[in-house]
Each structure stands twice: as structure tokens, then as C-alpha cells.
């Protein structure tokens, strides 16, 4: 796997990403789930996407509520991630139920978020494959 160019990596969402993936996000939630011997084995070790992602998105909002974002740019990064997810919902519906073309989905994304075109194209092509 190639190492990304650090000068082109967006670090504005770093704190939201940490809250989402680590503590109190996925890592914390999965650790508690797997340690809970009162749960049946199938509930301890299976991944429930809606629950897991819902929890992780909720933990991002805790960053603001608990004063964990160190500066306004990190909070902006969290809001940018929320916007990206909303755009994903529109694009997914457009592609899979409204008959959007690849180009329509790319143009919608470009018009509504500040991401590099190559990132948008890669995302759209991933949605098309799913």
C-alpha cells in the first residue's frame, strides 16, 4: 500500500476521526461488547453496522458537547464529515433508484462539498460498485 503524501492529507477532521474510531467510538464500543459475558456469544462478536456506525457518529457530536475539539477548525472538520455523509445519501439514492449517471453523481458532489475531484470520483465509483 502506498504511503499517502502527508502534505496533501486533510488533518482538519483528525479529532472527529479519533472520536469516531477510537474512544469513545468503535474501539471503546467493541471492547465493551466483547468483554460483556452476559451477552450471548453471537451478540458479543458480530458486527451490527447500523448500531456500530450510529454509535460512532454520535460520539463525534460528543466532541462539541464535552468541549473536546481543540479549535474551531477541528469542529469544522466534524461538520464537513456530516455534510459528506448527507451527500453520500443523496448520491446513493440518485445512482441506485433515480437513474443518475456517474457524471451526474460526480457533479452533484462537486457542487456540494469541497473535496478534490479525484476523491469524489473514487467515492462515486465505489458507490456504483456496491
Please annotate each region the language model reported.
Residues 1-130:
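Long, His/Glu/Asp-enriched segments that create or flank divalent metal/ion-associated functional microenvironments
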Amino acid at each position: 500500500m502506498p504511503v499517502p503524501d502527508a502534505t496533501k492529507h486533510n488533518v482538519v477532521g483528525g479529532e472527529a476521526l479519533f472520536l469516531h474510531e477510537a474512544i469513545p467510538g468503535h474501539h471503546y464500543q467493541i471492547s465493551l461488547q466483547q468483554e460483556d459475558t452476559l451477552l450471548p456469544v453471537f451478540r458479543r462478536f458480530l458486527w451490527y453496522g447500523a448500531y456500530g456506525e450510529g454509535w460512532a457518529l454520535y460520539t463525534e457530536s460528543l466532541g462539541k458537547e464535552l468541549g473536546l475539539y481543540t479549535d474551531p477548525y477541528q469542529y469544522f472538520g466534524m461538520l464537513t464529515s456530516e455534510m459528506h455523509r448527507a451527500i453520500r445519501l443523496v448520491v446513493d439514492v440518485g445512482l441506485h433508484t433515480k437513474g443518475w449517471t456517474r457524471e451526474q453523481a460526480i457533479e452533484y458532489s462537486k457542487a456540494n462539498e469541497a473535496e478534490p475531484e479525484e476523491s469524489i470520483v473514487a467515492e462515486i465509483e465505489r458507490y456504483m460498485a456496491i
